[in-house]
Amino acid sequence: MSKVCEISGKRPIVANSIQRRGKAKREGGVGKKTTGISKRRQYPNLQKVRVRVAGQEITFRVAASHIPKVYELVERAKGLRLEGLSPKEIKKELLKLL
């Protein structure tokens, strides 16, 4: 499974992990010194959200910040004719509403 939000497109980003030593100036020291910088990845907080649309259960992988958007899509879909479609097709139709 990819680590990408299906609604917002949030994906892992590259950040730096900075190792420091010393005592902060505000605590009476001479200041923090950087002893090493290495790359690390920050992942979005992806959650699986299952909803029922047109009698079908559909699973979305979305960032936690976009979970309400899934339920908003389900509300908007109530006017659409989705009966007889596969879950994959229903999901495509819902994502078109964005």
Swiss-Prot record:
SUPFAM superfamilies: L28p-like (SSF143800). The keyword Glycoprotein does not apply. Keywords: Ribonucleoprotein, Ribosomal protein. It comes from the Bacteria. Pfam families: Ribosomal_L28. GO terms for cellular component: ribonucleoprotein complex; ribosome. GO terms for molecular function: structural constituent of ribosome. Transmembrane segments: none annotated. InterPro entries: Bacterial_rp_bL28 (IPR050096), Ribosomal_bL28 (IPR026569), Ribosomal_bL28/bL31-like_sf (IPR034704), Ribosomal_bL28_bact-type (IPR001383). One of its GO terms (biological process) is translation. HAMAP family: Ribosomal_bL28. Belongs to the bacterial ribosomal protein bL28 family. This is Large ribosomal subunit protein bL28. The lineage of its organism: Bacteria, Thermotogati, Deinococcota, Deinococci, Thermales. The gene is rpmB.
